[in-house]
Design a protein with these regions (language model features):
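Beta-propeller domain segments
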Residues: 26-42, 155, 172-211, 220-222, ...
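Beta-strand-rich domains and repeat architectures in extracellular enzymes and scaffolds
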Residues: 49-74, 319-325, 341, 345
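Surface loop/turn motifs at the tips and blade-to-blade linkers of beta-strand repeat domains
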Residues: 51-55, 98-103, 143-150, 214-219, ...
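Beta-rich catalytic cores
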Residues: 54-57, 78, 96, 103-104, ...
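Residue-level detector of Asp-centered blade-edge/turn motifs that repeat once per structural unit
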Residues: 63-66, 110-112, 160-163, 227-232, ...
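Conserved beta-propeller blade signature
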Residues: 68-72, 114-117, 165-169, 234-238, ...
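Asp-box/WD-like beta-propeller blade repeats and closely related beta-sheet repeat scaffolds
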Residues: 96-97, 105, 121-161, 217
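Blade-level signature of beta-propeller repeat domains, shared across WD40, Kelch, NHL, RCC1
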Residues: 397-423
């Protein structure tokens, strides 16, 4: 029998607030079965599958306890910025997409019976039922408004702790806090008052602004990937590093060094911490905190005696956009409580990028070097590219079965990585 697939788009009334797209099939019990992502390279025993495509610019993602997937889009698709994805026939592929929320953004998180989301200037939450389904998609509570967004690095990543606090990244909109038209850094950097840090707000209070929150940590240029580590009960973040060393300071940095520096860095962050931007950066080659050239540095002078040290460092310009501490049991024991990182860019030094990396942890600290876990999302050899980049990993989530989901914000593909135990 020929498969007949009907695509029905229903704009549901204000009673629900959903835009609903369903795939209906006749005569085929597996009309949209997940297809293997044969180009994605994963370790032995693992497999990658494509469970959804053409989602739009899919940023962060969260999976409910029943397996529903909520994904945040950085641009609206059919007028909606959040989509609930559902596999109704359990064939491994998404066949129902339900859109809601009329704002784009990056952040999304489930905690304490609520779905938390963000736009580039605000934070919202939606009440969930016992199945972690959104009850009133057209009536979110507004938790925070008025966050800085000035056209560069505007995404507001979010995470919620166990004490009803929500943490929000507010990135810098300036690469190094230079005075306009000069190579000199502003001292003190005025951006630090309202950006380049993590702000803490109440997760259960509406209509908050900067004045209601706490600048939890400062000196972080841009954090897109962040997660709450359940083993340490602390916040971990991934910082995007700065650039343009050779452009502004050719007397101190060669083009090669400019491609190698600074490191992308992982920090364990506590209240009052300062990671040092814009005054210093971390050099993973020298393994030192180096004084920024805008503030008197020459590529060798150290600085930041009172700033925190990174717990892990990675090659420059790889763009860490997702961070997830793995707590599942599907993957082998060595992955338990370790950190997965989605890298959204590439390293000129390694000619590698657009990958998911893994850092093993023991007793709440990295216990070994980082490694490539899932690779070749780019779809081309970055050392000798033969075509455009195909996919850019961005968000990470753990499914109720322990599988790992990876979003792609370039072409809107959703991947699921699973492990099959040897028989």
């Amino acid at each position: 029998m020929h498969k007949i697939v009907f695509r029905v788009t229903l704009l549901v009334t204000a009673l629900t607030g959903f835009t609903h797209t369903a795939a209906l099939a006749s005569g085929d019990t597996t009309p949209n079965a997940a297809k293997p992502a044969v180009d994605i390279k994963v370790p032995a025993g693992f497999s990658a599958a494509i469970v959804a495509e053409d989602l739009g610019p899919a940023r962060h993602i969260v999976v409910s306890k029943t397996g529903d997937i909520y994904v945040k889009l950085s641009k609206l698709k059919d007028g909606k910025g959040i989509y609930r994805l559902r596999d109704t026939n359990k064939d491994g592929s998404i066949d129902e997409k339900t859109g809601f929320g009329d704002y784009p953004g990056t952040g999304i998180y489930i905690k304490n019976g609520y779905l938390y989301t963000s736009s580039n200037t605000s934070v919202f939450r939606y009440k969930l039922n016992d199945k972690e389904e959104v009850l009133q998609p057209d009536q979110p509570e507004t938790l925070v408004t008025g966050l800085v967004a000035k056209g560069r690095d505007e995404s507001k990543s979010i995470v919620v702790d166990n004490q009803q606090h929500i943490y929000v990244n507010v990135a810098s909109y300036n690469d190094a806090c230079r005075e306009p038209g000069t190579g000199k850094g502003m001292m003190p950097c005025p951006l630090l008052d309202s950006a380049a840090g993590i702000w803490q707000f109440r997760a259960d209070r509406q209509n908050q602004t900067y004045g209601d929150g706490i600048k939890y940590a400062t000196g972080l240029k841009n954090v897109v990937g962040l997660d709450w580590n359940p083993k340490t009960n602390t916040l971990f973040v991934m910082q995007h590093g700065r650039g343009q060393f050779h452009d502004f300071y050719p007397q101190y940095y060669t083009p090669q060094q400019s491609g190698q520096l600074p490191a992308e860095t992982m920090y364990e962050v506590r209240k009052g911490d300062d990671a040092g931007w814009p005054y210093i950066y971390y050099d993973h080659i020298q393994k030192k905190k180096i004084l920024a050239p805008e503030y008197g540095g020459d590529g060798k002078k150290t600085g930041g005696a009172k700033t925190i040290d990174p717990v892990a460092a990675f090659p420059a310009h790889m763009g860490p956009n997702g961070l997830l501490f793995y707590t599942g049991t599907m993957f082998p024991e060595r992955y338990r409580n370790g950190a997965f990182i989605a890298f959204h860019g590439q390293s000129p030094e390694l000619k590698k990028g657009y990958m998911v990396a893994f850092v093993p942890f023991k007793n709440g600290k990295p216990s070994g070097p980082w490694e490539i876990f899932a690779d070749n999302f780019a779809g081309t050899d970055l050392a000798k590219p033969t075509g455009p980049i195909q996919h850019r990993p961005c968000g990470l989530a753990q499914g109720p079965d322990g599988s790992l989901y990876v979003t792609d914000d370039l072409n809107g593909t959703l991947y699921q990585i699973s492990y099959a135990r040897p028989q």
